[in-house]
C-alpha cells in the first residue's frame, strides 16, 4: 500500500488564462508500506522487491530519475548494528582511563542520549556534565532568553554550578516531555555508580577547570569543540564519533560516526548509525534500474534537516541527513523562479503565450551554469539535494506507526517543461 504526497508543477500565480497542459502533476512522493525488517534480512533485496511489488500493484511505471529511499533504521537493524551499555562502557574506560571525565554539550533527549550517558558513567568514576544553556545544540531549551534577562545572567560569560542554576531558575521542565533533564541526567550518572557534577556553560573550554579528559557530545559542532579543547590543553579529547568505531566484545560499530546517530533500542542497547550505507544505496539503485530498465537513484536517510517552528527544535540529531546516496543525488537545485518570470519578465503575457515564454526560458537555461546571485533564481535557495530529499522522506515516513520506512519519489528533478 502507498501513501501519496503530490506537488503541483505549475504555481497558482501563473494561471492568468485558459490553456491546456499535457501534464498536471509534478513531484509525487509515496510512502511504501514494508514488512517488519529483522536482523539478518537482506535490506537491498527486501527494499527493491517491496518497491517493485508496490509499483506493479498500483500500476505505476518507473521513470528515469525516480528515487528509492530507505530509512537508516532499517539498514542498521538488518545489519544487527547494536551495542550494549556494558560494551560502550568498556570502550569508554579503555579510551579515557576511567577516572574523571568531562561530558560536554549533549542534547537533551531520552531516546538519543540517556543510554549513552549511562554507558559513559558506567565506565568512569566521575562525570563532569557540561550543559549548554539556555538550549542544547538542536534547540531543546532548559530556560528561555527572557528568564536569562530577568536573572541578569550572560550565557556566553557566566559559568554556573548546579546550585547557582537552581537558585536562578529552580526546576526546569521540558514543555514537550515533562522531564527535568538536569535532574534526570544527574540521576542517570549516579545510578550507574559514578559521581556527578553538573556545570552550565557555553564555552567548551570551561570543562578544563575540572578535568583534562573530555568526551565532546555535540553533533554538528564537534570538530570545533575538539579543536578548542586540544588547543587549550586537553589531554584526552574524544567525540562520540571516536567511541565504538570498532567492535567491542562482539558489538556493532560504525568506523565513521561511532556513537553519533545512535538511539535507544531497549533498556540495555542502542542502535548505531548504519555502516556501509553508500554500498547499500548503490546496490538498491542497481537492482531497481536492472528490474525497471530506468535510471533509478537511491539513498539511505535519517533525520530531516527541518526546524519545528513551534518548539524551536532543529530535528537533525543525526550527524548527516543521508549517510549513503547515489551519484545522481549530488549537487543543489539550479532553478528559475516562475513567479518572478510571470510577474516581472513576462508581465504583459497571459495564457498560452505566457506558458510558451516561460517554457522557452527554462529550456534555454544552462544546467551547468549556476544561477546563484541571479535575480531570476531569487527565493530558490540552493540547498544540497540530499538534505532536501532526505527531509522530504523523513516527513513522509514519519517516526511512529505509519509502517512506511521506504519512500518512492517521482518527478523531483522535473521542471515545467517536462511532459
Question: Language-model segments: what does each one mean?
Answer:
Residues 2-6:
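Short terminal hydrophobic/aromatic SLiMs and anchors at protein ends
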Residues 8-9, 13-64, 73-419:
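Conserved mixed alpha/beta catalytic, RNA-binding, or beta-rich assembly cores of soluble enzyme
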Amino acid at each position: 500500500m502507498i501513501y501519496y504526497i503530490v506537488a503541483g508543477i505549475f504555481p497558482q500565480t501563473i494561471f492568468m488564462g485558459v490553456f491546456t497542459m499535457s501534464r498536471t502533476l509534478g513531484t509525487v512522493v509515496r510512502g511504501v508500506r514494508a514488512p517488519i525488517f529483522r536482523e539478518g534480512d537482506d535490506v537491498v533485496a527486501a527494499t527493491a522487491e517491496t518497491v517493485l511489488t508496490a509499483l506493479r500493484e498500483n500500476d505505476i511505471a518507473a521513470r528515469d530519475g525516480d528515487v528509492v529511499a530507505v530509512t537508516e533504521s532499517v539498514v542498521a537493524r538488518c545489519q544487527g548494528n547494536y551495542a550494549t551499555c556494558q560494551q560502550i562502557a568498556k570502550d569508554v574506560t579503555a579510551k579515557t582511563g576511567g577516572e574523571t571525565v568531562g561530558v560536554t554539550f549533549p542534547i537533551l533527549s531520552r531516546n538519543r542520549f540517556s543510554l549513552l550517558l549511562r554507558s559513559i558513567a558506567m565506565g568512569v568514576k566521575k562525570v563532569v556534565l557540561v550543559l549548554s544553556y539556555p538550549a542544547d545544540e538542536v534547540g531543546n531549551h532548559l530556560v528561555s532568553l527572557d528568564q536569562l534577562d530577568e536573572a541578569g545572567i550572560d550565557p556566553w560569560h557566566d559559568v554556573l554550578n548546579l546550585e547557582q542554576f537552581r537558585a536562578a531558575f529552580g526546576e526546569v521542565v521540558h514543555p514537550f516531555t515533562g522531564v527535568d533533564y538536569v535532574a534526570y541526567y544527574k540521576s542517570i550518572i549516579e545510578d550507574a555508580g559514578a559521581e556527578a557534577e553538573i556545570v552550565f556553560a557555553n564555552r567548551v573550554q570551561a570543562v578544563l577547570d575540572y578535568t583534562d579528559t573530555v568526551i565532546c557530545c555535540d553533533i554538528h559542532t564537534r570538530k570545533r569543540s575538539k579543536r578548542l579543547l586540544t588547543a587549550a590543553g586537553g589531554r584526552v579529547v574524544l567525540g562520540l564519533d571516536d567511541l565504538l568505531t570498532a567492535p567491542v566484545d562482539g558489538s556493532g560499530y560504525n568506523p565513521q560516526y561511532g556513537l553519533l546517530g545512535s538511539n535507544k533500542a531497549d533498556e540495555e542497547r542502542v542502535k548505531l548509525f548504519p555502516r556501509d550505507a553508500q554500498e547499500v544505496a548503490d546496490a538498491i539503485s542497481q537492482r531497481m534500474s536492472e528490474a525497471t530498465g530506468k535510471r533509478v537513484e537511491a539513498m539511505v536517510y535519517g533525520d530531516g534537516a527541518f526546524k519545528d517552528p513551534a518548539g524551536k527544535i532543529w530535528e537533525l540529531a543525526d550527524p548527516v541527513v543521508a549517510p549513503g546516496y547515489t551519484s545522481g543525488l549530488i549537487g543543489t537545485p539550479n532553478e528559475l523562479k516562475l513567479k518572478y518570470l510571470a510577474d516581472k519578465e513576462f508581465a504583459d503575457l497571459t495564457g498560452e503565450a505566457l506558458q510558451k515564454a516561460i517554457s522557452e526560458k527554462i529550456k534555454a537555461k544552462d544546467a551547468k551554469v549556476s544561477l546563484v546571485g541571479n535575480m531570476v533564481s531569487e527565493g530558490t535557495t540552493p540547498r544540497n539535494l540530499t538534505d532536501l530529499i532526505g527531509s522530504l522522506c523523513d516527513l513522509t515516513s514519519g517516526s511512529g506507526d505509519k509502517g512506511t520506512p521506504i519512500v518512492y519519489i517521482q518527478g523531483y528533478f522535473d521542471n515545467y517543461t517536462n511532459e
